[in-house]
């Protein structure tokens, strides 16, 4: 049930606001005769409201991809600093194997890579993004992702819903500080 509905037009923008028992909603749309600034604003809003999906084949770092065998990942990356295997726990079962390199972690469940994480600028994504790159390069490469902010860190998430997988880029200021590629275990 809508408790309040307001429509107003300011500077060529129509703003509809609705407040209901379900929460708050706002719709911003241009009115007839809008100027170029309004067109740019609308395209930015549309882009950020519809995060870009990412193809599963693009989910990887330095040639290591989700779903590949842990042995193949080890061959590509060389001998790890640490190689640990632990039980997966009651919820998922199986075994979790973690390969640790210099600022790079690869985790596998039952022999298949499900997580790759790095803070090392030497390791790039399949599309060429690395730690230290700026947000403009990220947006040019991947478009806009789903965005969340926690403290000083902004997380841009690009999902592949068909395989319940994603690429997460953590930015501090305008620079990538961490890259995470992962898939849901089930």
Can you describe what each PLM-predicted range is?
Residues 8-9, 38, 49, 99:
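N-terminal compositionally biased, intrinsically disordered segments and leader/signal-like regions
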Residues 20-42:
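Signal peptide processing junction and immediate N-terminal pro/mature segment
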Residues 28-31, 43-45, 50, 54, ...:
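A cross-family detector of function-defining hotspots
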Residues 1-27:
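Sec-dependent N-terminal signal peptides
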Residues 127:
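Glycine-rich loop/hinge motif
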Residues 117-118:
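Short, basic/glycine-rich phosphate-binding loops at helix/coil junctions
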